[in-house]
């Protein structure tokens, strides 16, 4: 973490359980991020929190620290049964649930609290086997949680802590009815600690907090600037015919260490992947119909640096903790202006700088005014020389080949095709 991203407040300054502090310091967490410094005094006092902060600001560790401390500092209810978790953390996507679980594991090892994971797609029996042995903290997506609850594999009557992560995304994906179903099976709001964290807190999310939380305190970090001052934004106006060649030229010029390219449809993502894989890039494809095990493998390869570029739909835009992303390319401007914020929030994280490049083509340029109104500023426009765009490009690969691209990354210098103007 960059020092500019941290406050002077230390975790050890709070009256946290010693095992929690020990686990944090062992992982190198000493100073709090702004959202952590705001949230912890409230949660340690037993107050509910609804927190808004840009992605990469430490929301996950804020609610995990609070959850582990609360469970260690408060006894479980009397006569708690083996199928009754003490804390429930709900996430909108499988990938985010897996990431939260990974972040929680060091705390679990240090404290002895048991973790469970529940998400759809695969691993039903494996997840169930863990639950049957009893867990303290259950992390999951709403569909699988409801499935287990209806079959009495889990019972929520002993819940002492509940967390909603990326609550606005829950609305986007239509999960609010599921969330309310789960809340109705928990103890009343005033008998548990409730936390809600998200990059955006819309009116409907605040309404949910009012319904399901106990007079929550609202906390915000940098609410006046939605896109983050560390992200350099840039906009091009290509024709549809030049759009792909412009993207490939920009990649050659920027030569990003780690980049995510967002497009609005699965078909468009597959097209982009085919062009880049054919050109020798180490590129992965992440769309909604990719099998869960493969999605997790691709994310792991990208995080490790075995892949340099990830082409994705917005399934990857929310909540995932992928470190050191240097560039985000909006091949398509998103239809939802909030998705623009979440997309470019993949870069410029944890105090680092980042670069966002958007292509406003003939098809999606009409989305730009709403995006600029939402973020509160115009995106700087850059020009390019059409005659300098790459032309010697190989025929794109088709998806009959492996999606993650197995060609070695080129080690030569980028082609000299600087844009003019």
Curated annotation (Swiss-Prot):
A single Gene Ontology CC term: cytosol
SMART domains, alphabetized: DEXDc (SM00487), HELICc (SM00490)
Keyword terms, alphabetized: ATP-binding, Cytoplasm, Helicase, Hydrolase, Nucleotide-binding, RNA-binding
Organism superkingdom: Bacteria
Location of the protein in the cell: Cytoplasm
Domain Helicase C-terminal: residue ranges: 245-390
InterPro entries on file: DEAD/DEAH_box_helicase_dom, DEAD_box_RNA_helicase, Helicase_ATP-bd, Helicase_C-like, P-loop_NTPase, RNA-helicase_DEAD-box_CS, RNA_helicase_ATP-dep_RhlB, RNA_helicase_DEAD_Q_motif
Binding-site residues for ATP, renumbered to this chain: 53-60
Transmembrane domains' residue ranges: none
Protein function: DEAD-box RNA helicase involved in RNA degradation. Has RNA-dependent ATPase activity and unwinds double-stranded RNA.
Protein name (database record): ATP-dependent RNA helicase RhlB
């Amino acid at each position: 973490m960059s020092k500019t991203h941290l406050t002077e407040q230390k975790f050890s300054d709070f009256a946290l359980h010693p095992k929690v502090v020990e686990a944090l310091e062992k992982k190198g967490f000493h100073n709090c991020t702004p959202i952590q410094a705001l949230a912890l005094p409230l949660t340690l006092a037993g107050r509910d929190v609804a927190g808004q902060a840009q992605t990469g600001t430490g929301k996950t560790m804020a609610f995990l620290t609070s959850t582990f401390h609360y469970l260690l500092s408060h006894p479980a209810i009397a006569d708690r049964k083996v199928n009754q978790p003490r804390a429930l953390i709900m996430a909108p996507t499988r990938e985010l649930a897996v990431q939260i679980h990974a972040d929680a594991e060091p705390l679990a090892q240090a404290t002895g609290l048991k973790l469970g994971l529940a998400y759809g797609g695969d691993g039903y029996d494996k997840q169930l086997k863990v639950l049957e042995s009893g867990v303290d903290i259950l992390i999951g997506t709403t569909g699988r949680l409801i499935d287990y609850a209806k079959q009495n594999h889990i019972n929520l009557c002993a819940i002492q802590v509940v967390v909603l992560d990326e609550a606005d995304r829950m609305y986007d994906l239509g999960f609010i009815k599921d969330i309310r179903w789960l809340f109705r099976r928990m103890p009343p709001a005033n008998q548990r600690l409730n936390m809600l964290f998200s990059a955006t807190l819309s009116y409907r999310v605040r309404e949910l907090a009012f319904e399901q939380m106990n007079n929550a305190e609202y906390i915000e970090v940098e609410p006046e600037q939605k896109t983050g001052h560390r992200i350099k934004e840039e906009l091009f106006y290509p024709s549809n015919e030049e759009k792909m060649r412009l993207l490939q030229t920009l990649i050659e010029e920027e030569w990003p260490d780690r980049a995510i390219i967002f497009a609005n449809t699965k078909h468009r993502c597959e097209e982009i992947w085919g062009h880049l894989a054919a050109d020798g890039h180490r590129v992965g494809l992440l769309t909604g119909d990719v099998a869960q095990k493969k999605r997790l493998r691709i994310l792991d390869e990208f995080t490790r640096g075995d892949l340099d570029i990830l082409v994705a739909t917005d399934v990857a835009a929310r909540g995932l903790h992928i470190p050191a992303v240097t560039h985000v390319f909006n091949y398509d401007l998103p239809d939802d202006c909030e998705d623009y914020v979440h997309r470019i929030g993949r870069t410029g994280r944890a105090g680092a700088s980042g670069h966002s490049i958007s292509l406003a083509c003939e098809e999606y340029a009409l989305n730009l005014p709403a995006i600029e109104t939402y973020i509160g500023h115009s995106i700087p426009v850059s020009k390019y020389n059409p005659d300098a765009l790459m032309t010697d490009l190989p025929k794109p690969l088709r998806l009959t080949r492996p999606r993650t691209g197995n060609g070695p990354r080129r080690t030569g210098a980028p082609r000299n095709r600087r844009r003019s103007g």
